[in-house]
Amino acid sequence: MKSDNQPASGALLASEKTASLGSVRRRSFLTTLGLGSAALAVTPTARSQDKVIQGFERAPTAPDASRGWKPVSDRKIRVGLVGYGVCQFGAAFSFQDHPNVEVVAVSDLIPDRCGALAKAARCDKTYPSLEELVKDDRIEAVFVATDAPSHPRHCLEVLKHGKHVASAVPAVFGSLEDAHRLFEAVKASGLKYMMFETSYFHEDLYGMRQVYNAGGLGKLLYAEGEYFHYMPTPIDSFKGWRIGLPPQWYPTHSNAYYVGVTGGSFTEVSCMAAPSRLDHLQPANNRYRNPFGTEIALFRTSEEGMARMGVSWDSPGYGGEMGRIRGQKGSYYGKYEGSEGNLPDIKRPPLPPGVEAGGHGGSHGYLMNEFVTAILQDRKPLVDIAQALNMTVAGIVAHESAMKGGERLKIPQLKMW
């Protein structure tokens, strides 16, 4: 899981900081949701002793990663960072290292975490909550790295205060109503919204997108995307939101292997799933009444092709985010094979000096730079609100299909034009 787990509301008591998820059997789960003395904070010190969470292994930054980089402006964007939970996501994208960024304030509800984020971001100003940070008139843009259920509410709060917003995934959490509300708010605001979907800047998906846009693939006939992350015990999360999480509510790492290549969408879905053997994925043990740890969705695409997108929590073995695509004129699985010989450069663009590639396949620095550059150039970010929601909403409907035994369901379409 990649979204950080800062608590959602500034009114929380200190004793309600973080769910302790050592055991997720029925009694422990109810204790966790009951909060009180059973809810324990995960301190930065404790986190540093844990095994690195899948996806957060830092990819090496190539020695020539900044070769050819040219600034598009000499202006510095004033940014606020919110959220420094178990994944320490608030500082993971190197906003603090970008030559066109000044991190002017940070926030986390838990004081120790807030202080650690301030230190990591080399920032002196802290706020006790997002709701207080967004009142700072100096701030132009905010990165929301809070708990996944709070992403839509927090992004709406940022937009309401006239600031650009970047969000960790997913854009919304199981709610089609939140999706439409956020979509309309972004359109009405005229501000930049970007979801930091890491697959977009994986080397393979970046290459797929370049070749597709150059016409080297034609219409895609078939796409596959997979996000496999074995979690017999869920990663710690505020109020245990990861306990029993429906796989297709966290679909963007896999769904990006179509939407992130073509800019298209999914129009209908039939999703199959099997009951899980894991404790936290028993319906009685999670707030979602979710019985599934693996959900495999077959989508119809906006190009009238097909896409198989899978998310799995309960199958041990190889993990990560990966994908393959086949088009009318060629295919791409690690490399391009097809009929077109005149292809574009598929190397990822240069990073600003001092910015590392980071985690999730070396995507972090590229995503942050794309958001910053879109603001400076006053253009649409790559992972805009339409693409963010077309990935996320498709998963919400896919889980509904799985709960209905694979019934084929239509998917709402969200377009900026």
Where are these regions (language model features)?
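Predominantly a Rossmann-like dinucleotide-binding segment in NAD(P)-dependent oxidoreductases
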Residues: 189-289
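N-terminal Rossmann-like dinucleotide-binding module
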Residues: 40-121
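C-terminal capping/lid region of NAD(P)-dependent oxidoreductase domains
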Residues: 45, 49-51, 191, 218-222, ...
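N-terminal export leaders
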Residues: 25-42
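Contiguous beta-strand/loop segments that form the cofactor/metal-binding neighborhood of enzyme cores
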Residues: 57-69, 73, 249-340, 365-381, ...
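Glycine- and charged-residue-rich phosphate/anionic-cofactor binding loop of Rossmann-like
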Residues: 102, 374-391
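Beta-strand-loop-alpha-helix segment that lines the small-molecule cofactor/substrate pocket
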Residues: 141, 147-148, 152-200, 215
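N-terminal secretory signal peptides
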Residues: 1-24, 50-51
